[in-house]
Amino acid sequence: MRPYKLPQKALIAEIFNSDDRFRSTTKEVEAVEQERAVIVGMDNDEGYDTLEELNELAKTAGALVVGKVRVRRRTIDNATYVGSGKANELSLMGSELEADLFIFDDELSAIQLRTLEETLGARVIDRTTLILDIFAARATSREGKLQVELAQMRYRLPRLIGQGQVLSRLGGGIGTRGPGEKKLEIDRRRIRRRVFELETELSEIEKQRGLRRESRKANRIPLVALVGYTNAGKSTMLNALTDSNVLAEDKLFATLDPVVRKITLSGGTEALLSDTVGFINKLPHDLVEAFKSTLEEVSNSDLILQVVDISCPYHEKQMRVVDGVLESLHAADIPRIIVFNKADAIPSCDLPAESENRLNVSALCGTGIEKLLSAVELKLNSARTEVDILVPYSKYEAVSMIRDRGMLLSEEHTETGTHIRALLDAESIGQLRKILDF
């Protein structure tokens, strides 16, 4: 029998066998590529397990966590973070566990990075580098990629001093991905030049964002910003509120690029809902700075919905982290509704008491969504004043302005003009006074 004339059954069997061999090889390659990591952090008295959060971050980045080490020290060692004795212990542990990578729960200086890599004989990254790496993997828009690269460059620049050996290992692995990765011979001058290029390009993008913001203000469409700790369920909440299909995953930083959806509330009020990047404990300063233009959407919002994962044992600590970020964005005084999400995941007797500004909701099940929408409309309209006015037909532009900038409650045409009842903000009322001379 000629080799190219196999019976059909044998041919099909061979195809399936080849497919199985390919899948097996792919899994083996993936298993080899998955880095074995040991995570290290300082024990704290905050009642909040930051090391467990670091563990989730490492998994999100694709690492296989093979060891966790909590270190109790009064002060952080300037050279090794954990002290020379503990560093030697970690070196032995890394050898036993065949670790490729050590991830530390706090930012490390250039000296600490260099000393630890020499002592441990493996790659070393810190929490900030890990978070930046996740952002690099998740960024999809042009602006998002530029912002991540800028944050990476700014973070690496002061850590170049005396790090020739460290930088020579930037050829791959967790903490080296994304647009921030450059050739091995990267130096301070090239980084500074690249930072300037990124800042210039992002400045142009920000101008376009500013124009859109001004257009929104001119149309008087209020902006409602969804904020919260990462994985609190903001994207699921946006989908529930707007009946849309934004990607919602049970992962840290599933949403990176901002998403805006328009919604018309039951009373006729139109609003824009914005889903922003999630916050996290020890959020890198360079990341906040790089994403400043995106986060300014929160600062310019008319109402903030702070989404809280009520099922998380550390939700109160997470709320304080979010409060701190909002404070840094000068957004702490913006009207806010606290939305305790995932209320279906805990017994009703354990849910917090509700009030006008604190509601229990399950975005996944839809429980409490209508109540939340009503609260949003009430909040938005509370900043408006009801006007009851007769607009002469000769001043009909006033009617158009009210329709465009306010919420029309009633409109009746009479012999002398149009009788209107509407909700308007202070600026629009001032404009109306100018048109009607009253």
Model-identified regions with their sequence ranges:
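Conserved nucleotide-binding/hydrolysis micro-motifs of P-loop NTPases
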Residues: 43-46, 73-75, 107-110, 129-132, ...
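Switch II of P-loop NTPase G domains
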Residues: 16-29, 48-52, 75-92, 257-258, ...
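N-terminal accessory targeting/assembly segments
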Residues: 1-131
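Conserved C-terminal guanine-recognition region of P-loop GTPase G domains, centered on the G4
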Residues: 26, 51-59, 91-96, 107-122, ...
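Switch I (effector-binding) loop of TRAFAC-class P-loop GTPase G-domains
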Residues: 20-22, 209, 216-222, 240-271, ...
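Short alpha-helix plus adjacent loop in nuclease-associated cores
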Residues: 129-150
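C-terminal-of-GTPase-core extension/linker across diverse P-loop GTPases
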Residues: 1-38, 55, 158-232, 238-239, ...
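Conserved beta-strand segments of the P-loop GTPase G domain that flank and frequently precede/overlap
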Residues: 39-43, 68-71, 103-105, 306-309, ...
